[in-house]
Amino acid sequence: MRPAGRSNNQVRPVTLTRNYTKHAEGSVLVEFGDTKVLCTASIEEGVPRFLKGQGQGWITAEYGMLPRSTHTRNAREAAKGKQGGRTMEIQRLIARALRAAVDLKALGEFTITLDCDVLQADGGTRTASITGACVALADALQKLVENGKLKTNPMKGMVAAVSVGIVNGEAVCDLEYVEDSAAETDMNVVMTEDGRIIEVQGTAEGEPFTHEELLTLLALARGGIESIVATQKAALAN
């Protein structure tokens, strides 16, 4: 029996609260069960030096965890003087995922920074960050259109992510912390709304997994992501 009695293919309750803060062009509080992440999208005119004069935009991301988002306090990375490898890996993943959602040529020479701050962690913080940041990004892009900075919205479609894994020999979707810490296999999957794969991060933490198990996990992820995308679209429609 999974925590909260979920079936193996069931994601946790997903909530997306838009316009959560007042200053950012897009802001979303995303909740996957007890995992809560604040995602903001900030627009700047201009692009990094390596893109200057090419007529296209850029999307980047930063990720961080509040000191007491976890069971025991973790010192802020700013206090340590440097970002950890996990943080850098996750923020690059978020940026890659969200660039797949946008026509960067149509964006023009704007940079959008997605800041994902974990308020409470109970597994799946990177997948929640991608899911919430995509909605914040959609709001920010719509503001560029409404303000006359862009003629058409460069958003190609929604992007969402979910964790899948093998726990006690069973393939399950959207792992919370107690499952994640005991998983034999742990995988994060990012997809477009039509089911195309952007990224797969998978590791056999305990027992190696088979090709058949990989296909099972990807199918589980696709079903979970379809449900999450429906929640994203419902949030944007309100």
Swiss-Prot record:
Its EC number is 2.7.7.56. One of its GO terms (molecular function) is tRNA binding. GO terms for biological process: rRNA catabolic process; rRNA processing; tRNA processing. It catalyses: tRNA(n+1) + phosphate = tRNA(n) + a ribonucleoside 5'-diphosphate. InterPro entries: ExoRNase_PH_dom1 (IPR001247), ExoRNase_PH_dom2 (IPR015847), ExoRNase_PH_dom2_sf (IPR036345), PNPase/RNase_PH_dom_sf (IPR027408), Ribosomal_Su5_D2-typ_SF (IPR020568), RNase_PH (IPR050080), RNase_PH_bac-type (IPR002381), RNase_PH_CS (IPR018336). Homohexameric ring arranged as a trimer of dimers. Belongs to the RNase PH family. This is Ribonuclease PH.
